[in-house]
Design a protein with these regions (language model features):
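Conserved beta-alpha junction segments in alpha/beta enzyme cores
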Residues: 1-84, 88-128
């Protein structure tokens, strides 16, 4: 079995765009939030991609778009791509919340970073 791991910073800018911040954003960031990625290649027995996001929640349309892009990049079927969230109340909610979509540009950048990371994971697979 082969595997590769990456951790990508996804901390959003502190520019007041959060619709319902649970924290005082003016004090800065104590700890960045991340996307953690694990690519597994079972060498002929299939594979899987696990993505963990430090966010409160991800809306279904946003989740489906990310999953589709990851399936396209990896060649894995959707049942082999698992995306989960930490449900941190100190992190953004992704999706249309009360018709608020101000985090859209940040989420697009997060997806781009995740996809870029996954593209490099395939070249970094190591025996485990």
């Amino acid at each position: 079995m082969l595997a590769a791991f990456d951790k990508v910073v996804i901390t959003p800018p502190l520019d007041g765009t959060w619709p319902d911040a649970f924290i005082d954003l003016k004090t800065g960031v104590l700890d960045d939030i991340h996307a953690r990625l694990l690519l597994i290649d079972a060498q002929g027995q299939g594979g899987a991609l696990l993505v963990s996001l430090d966010v409160l929640n991800v809306g279904l349309p946003e989740m489906q778009r990310l999953e589709s892009a990851l399936c396209h990049v990896t060649g894995l079927p959707s049942e082999a791509v698992w995306i989960m969230v930490s449900h941190s109340h100190s992190a953004p909610i992704v999706g249309a919340i009360d018709d608020y979509t101000g985090l859209g540009p940040w989420w697009s950048a997060v997806c781009d970073r995740i996809i870029s990371s996954v593209q490099t994971l395939g070249r970094r697979l190591q025996p485990v």
